[in-house]
């Protein structure tokens, strides 16, 4: 989204935003069942926002930052909430008649790509994962002054692990 938190599912579904992000319809046209939820802090899950217009004074960013900070200060993290929501969505998706539970995959770009990495390492139902624009180590980001996506701020993770270890923890059929 290029920090465009006012977009979420609508961009992936091809309704607004960059056509390069509209992979949902392409997958659906090719026979995939596609579920595109708004992640917390994006589009319809933003605080004090409705629709796809950005909030003034960069409030979409500040709301996202606050959401991360409040969770870290209370001993939690934003990625945990995103993963809980995503795993619940996968449970609901897998209950739909015609959905092959053995062939559930996940695809994401940027923050979605980070979510793919964590989700595919933790949820055994995922048989395919494709993370785009996200496989950059914490060490590389810090050494080169590259931003760290807010949901990837997981207290104490960097002391023990690196982002790329998430792919090693998976039993995936395919990783792109």
List each model region and its residues.
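Alpha-helical segments flanking ligand/cofactor-binding loops in enzyme cores
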Residues: 25, 117-118, 168
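Conserved dinucleotide-binding and phosphotransfer motif residues
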Residues: 30, 96, 123
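Mobile cap/lid helix-loop segments that gate and shape the active-site cleft of serine hydrolases
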Residues: 65-73, 88, 127-173
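Glycine-rich nucleophile elbow surrounding the catalytic serine of serine-hydrolase chemistry
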Residues: 108-120
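Conserved hydrolase catalytic core segment
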Residues: 121-127
